[in-house]
């Protein structure tokens, strides 16, 4: 005997098949291509309606996740049968879960059975009495919307997509600002080259251009709102003796247009930075307290979402952002990187070279806990107290490693050390009295004598070794010289013999 379990928007349907090996057929689509053939092959054995729309959503989610709900378990256990029957289901995970229940069913869920379910769902209204096509479509649409809302879990306060986009835009703005500022300095530098050396701030440079215009207006222009008094005097003095060339009004107009862009971009960047800071404190307050807004936002953007990042282990968080270096190290069998984006965190920056890796590991472990607290905690806490308390622990660990008191930014106040007033040391006049040299030798400690003897022995040994090395070197050099002399002598003898032969 074969049964087919069909999940609908209205409820669970258990269909009894006339052919118990129907699911093994290779021509299913041809055998079940009309409503009459489907109705002839399958009869409704049991049908369990859902109590409400919320109940339908709960059951649908259970099927998607591969869980057997209490309703489905009760529905299947009430089927009376003598022999073990075959149960065809559409979801493989659900089939495995039903098998574990130990019911009197042999569960089948494979690629071939999908054609069977496709044919049944196509002609489902004909099989289920009291359900017309329009009613079933409306139920399916309503359930689809409910599942969509459930998956999205939309919340105005927990939208981490805003953070991902904001940090990406912030990086783009920084690049644009740097490019525009460089272009503006090079452009206006032809007219007033000395200004770029005195004013390093790009926004202040652009505001001076907008306020002053050409350098001849410097003496009449008030720059007190942009620069301090001393710097203002320097700029005005430099403008009078500038080595720059003259520019036309059209040139100045275009330079001013670029300067306006720089000022506007800088103002928008500050606004975006404040927005990102507020969003981070709302979405991940504990992570923000631990690593800061920018590093936290970059970590979330790199992982894709706060939930994905919260599920990552501490080891992954530690090297997040250093994937290229990691895979290169694994490929070449070298040491793997110790830190990625966390390298720019203030706590890692305070550590010296040898301790950076240790602090990065500690910080990653604490960040993993803070992330889970932010993302998965049932109780909402925007204060970030947990993050500040964890940061204090990391700071104390850093202080222990560095051997010095580190500057803290946490809310946890350290206990102030009690100031002990000690008596000032007095001059000891008796220490001036010196004894004879013989007495001093007698009073010398035995430990010092031992050290001195060891030192003397070591020096003698080193001298002996040096002497032996020198003797060996001299012998070798002498031997080489003798060999060379012998060679020269033999050559000379040969030459003289040859000359004698030639004379003869």
Swiss-Prot record:
Acidic residues biased stretches: 433-445
Top-level taxon: Eukaryota
Main location: nucleus
Residue span of region Disordered: 405-504
InterPro entries for the chain: Nop56/Nop58, NOP58/56_N, Nop_C, Nop_dom, Nop_dom_sf, NOSIC
GO cellular component, one term: small-subunit processome
Alphabetized GO MF terms: snoRNA binding; snRNA binding
Residue ranges the record marks as coiled coil: 446-504
Ranges of compositional bias, category Basic and acidic residues: 405-423
Record GO biological process: box C/D sno(s)RNA 3'-end processing; endonucleolytic cleavage in 5'-ETS of tricistronic rRNA transcript (SSU-rRNA, 5.8S rRNA, LSU-rRNA); endonucleolytic cleavage in ITS1 to separate SSU-rRNA from 5.8S rRNA and LSU-rRNA from tricistronic rRNA transcript (SSU-rRNA, 5.8S rRNA, LSU-rRNA); endonucleolytic cleavage to generate mature 5'-end of SSU-rRNA from (SSU-rRNA, 5.8S rRNA, LSU-rRNA); protein localization to nucleolus; snoRNA guided rRNA 2'-O-methylation
Pfam families listed in its UniProt record: Nop, NOP5NT
Residue stretches of biased makeup (Basic residues): 451-478, 489-504
Domain Nop: 283-403
Function, in words: Required for pre-18S rRNA processing. May bind microtubules.
Protein family according to the UniProt entry: Belongs to the NOP5/NOP56 family.
Protein name, UniProt field: Nucleolar protein 58
Species, as recorded: Meyerozyma guilliermondii (strain ATCC 6260 / CBS 566 / DSM 6381 / JCM 1539 / NBRC 10279 / NRRL Y-324) (Yeast)
